[in-house]
A protein has these predicted regions:
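Electrostatic cytochrome c docking/interface patches
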Residues: 19-43, 54-65, 72-74
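Short, conserved charged micro-motifs
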Residues: 68, 116-120
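Structured domain cores in non-transmembrane regions
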Residues: 63-99, 103-105, 111
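Positively charged n-region of N-terminal signal peptides that target proteins for export
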Residues: 1-7
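C-type cytochrome heme c attachment motif
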Residues: 43-54, 94, 104-115
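Bacterial N-terminal signal peptides
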Residues: 7-16
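Solvent-exposed, acidic/flexible segments
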Residues: 31-38, 42, 98-101, 113-117
Length: 120
């Protein structure tokens, strides 16, 4: 009984604090001329996000738009395919993802288009 009471005392104030957060996102300042930063972001995305999420609205060869060569893309950013013209699919099987997480992680190109860069 004491444990339930202690849990209740902790849960109520914490839920109120979380609920009052308001879901405010800070404005992201993206400089599309900073190619080094964009290349670093592409590396972060392919190394971490693309493990679970797909980006089926984006092809690897579009990374040439930020100054990368085909060789750099193949060597540093491609892990699931050998064709630079392929779309960015998740390394994870969607059925496994749904089993592990309850739902497959969303495609991030759709999220970026619908909710904007500030959301990501």
């Amino acid at each position: 009984m004491k444990n339930w009471f202690a849990a209740l005392l902790l849960a109520v104030p914490m839920s109120a604090a979380v609920a009052s957060g308001g879901g405010h996102y800070e404005k992201v300042d993206i400089d599309l001329r900073d190619q080094v930063s964009l290349q670093h972001g592409a590396q972060i995305f392919t190394n971490y996000c693309l493990s679970c999420h797909s980006a089926s609205g984006m092809r690897f060869n579009r990374l040439k738009d930020i100054g990368l060569t085909d060789e750099e893309i193949k060597k540093n950013l491609m892990f699931t395919t050998d064709n630079v013209g392929d779309v960015m699919h998740s390394a994870m099987n969607p059925k496994d993802a749904a089993k592990w997480f309850g739902a497959a992680p969303p495609d991030l190109t759709l999220i970026a288009r619908s909710k904007g860069a500030d959301y990501l």
